[in-house]
Amino acid sequence: MHLFHEDHFTYELPNGWCSEGSGENLLIYDPNGNGAMTISFFSIFDMNKSLDEHISIMAKKFVEKNEISLYGPLILCGSKESKLTLYGTGVTSDKWFIKLWVIARYPRIAFATYQSEKKTSEVKKYDAIISRTNFAT
């Protein structure tokens, strides 16, 4: 099912999944699943760094502030012409699994996190959702 959030972000959900959104926040989940994804939306007003540097700094600040232990380095893919995606996985300070994605196409950024008590194959479904997201032009 193809959906729009606030006329500027498109995403697709598997059958039976739910999304709830208002303003600059969106929640996506499988009612019978293990975890949920929250997405917050931002706009860049002053860009004094490249887009990849900008989203890298955002992600690193989030990781530090929330005391997340990453399993490895953050990975950047995509292009600034379509969309850049920075992602990584780790555990929160209370030992929950977390995956984060920062999806960007200037001037918009979507910051998504998925959390569950433990890592399961469900995270692959969230990866698929993220891979099919787009910013409306």
What are these regions (language model features)?
Residues H2-I57:
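Secretory pathway targeting signatures of secreted, lumenal, and periplasmic proteins
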Residues E12, N32-N34, K80, I103-I109:
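Short, solvent-exposed coil/turn segments at beta-strand boundaries
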Residues W17, A110-T137:
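Surface-exposed amphipathic alpha-helical segments
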Residues S19, I28, T38, I98, ...:
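Short hydrophobic/aromatic-rich beta-strand segments that constitute the beta-sheet cores
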Residues S22-L26, S82, P107-R108:
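Beta-strand-connecting loop/turn residues
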Residues D30-N34, G90-T92, Q115-E117:
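Secondary-structure transition/turn motif
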Residues M58-Y106:
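Signature of long, low-cysteine stretches enriched in small and polar/charged residues
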